[in-house]
Amino acid sequence: RRGTVQHYFSGAVRVGNARAYKILIVAVLICATVLTMIVVNSLRFNPDPSRDQDFIARAQQKSVPGIKVKASALGGSESRRSFGENLGKYGIQPIWLEIENETDDQLVYLQIATDPDYYSPYEVSYRFHGIFSPAANLARDAFFLKRQIPSVVQPHSHSTGFVYGEADSGIKYARFVIVGSNRLETFDFALSVPGPAFVGTGVHADTIPRDQKVEDLDIDALRKVLTKISCCTTNSDATRLGDPLNLVIVEGERDPIIPFIARDWHLAQKLDIASIVETARAFIFRDEYLTSPVSPLFVFNRREDVAIQKARSTINERIHARLWLTPYTFQSRRIWIGQVSRDIGVRLTDQTWNLTTHKIGPDVDFDRSYLLQDLLMSGFVERYGFVGGVGAATMSDPRRNLTADPYYTDGLRLVAFLSNQTRTLGDIERLPWEQPPAPSDEAR
């Protein structure tokens, strides 16, 4: 019996030792994992601001007496390198900013005017905190805090730093509002963002063929010329008519894309392998794709110079516009002609390589009106009017675009003159040109 008891206790000891050994192994593994996480989290945070000059060099600059502002929006790889973390993963985009105050007054920069949903430095840093690495976390906090631009700029000094805003691609609209003693200054920027290729990020005067003369027009000549431009877009060899050219933009001093991106329009990506794959993914999963490519249309024997769109929550629905630079100017201001229509769904077709196409809404005047309202609400329009040139088409006898979608229209083109200063709705002039007719019984 004594041997049995000794055998029992020795067995229990062996079992206990085995359990203790397993617990020890687990504890060692946990400690090793925690240590690895600490090391990895510390090593991962490796910011490299040494190449910040890349985005500083392309900064845009605007000034008024006594105040100068420079700004640049960072692309994804620039942000990752400069801050040591993938901010784009969380939809965060830093904007580099420099404010020079040459006045005798203290100036205050209002970050909320740049982005109503801007992030605090601690909010950005905390997204990359490690559970077991307090020292690295403190270093991150200090780094992001130090790089935030101060809100106050003392007299005869300058401030530099970053605003942590929501991410955009292609072009980012940024408004900087600076307040002084009895003074308020607003600076609007359309900042280029490195990344995928977009339609319209590099449009300059040399878009017009060098052998084509640019004709400057007065207001009466402008009205006449705009009625004589072709009614519609075409295919690549100009043998078939497409969507109606129902839009004209006359530039002001600002970048003409600003009124659009200020109202949440986005540039369309160029049609390439990457955008095709992303389009397919968004179509399959019914996701939004704010910068999805558009099919090319042609005016002046070239495809659109700029393509912009405002998308809904699914890739199937969006309103989009294509714009072409014309060989005309108005008082030395460049003139664009374009078309605006609304995609209301997707359907099968034998007119495209992938056998599918967006279906446009047939009431293109509705979309023209929407765009006008958006431009008016932006505050960047000084006057507008309507001219002929498209030719009317009715609901009962519609015309068709290149993919055989029917559309009807009153035949008018919207002409919007962009302003050099923001204007209230009551200060915008309506030109006494053509007037859109009241809706007919057929359209009601």
Locate predicted features:
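N-terminal Sec-pathway targeting helices
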Residues: G11-A32
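Surface-exposed edge beta-strand/loop patches
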Residues: M37-L43, D117, R147-R210
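Low-complexity, acidic Ser/Thr/Pro/Gly-rich terminal tails and inter-domain linkers that flank the onset
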Residues: D48-Y90
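Short, solvent-exposed beta-strand/turn "edge" segments of beta-rich domains on protein surfaces
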Residues: S79-W96, E102-Q106, V152-Q154, D237-A238
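The feature marks short-to-medium sequence segments in extracytoplasmic or secretory-pathway proteins
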Residues: E102-Q154
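Short, hydrophobic/aromatic beta-strand segments
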Residues: D105-A113, R175, I257-I261
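A cross-kingdom signal targeting lumenal/periplasmic-facing segments of multi-pass membrane
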Residues: S157, G170, L271-P439
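Terminal, regulation- and interaction-focused segments at domain boundaries
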Residues: I229-P259
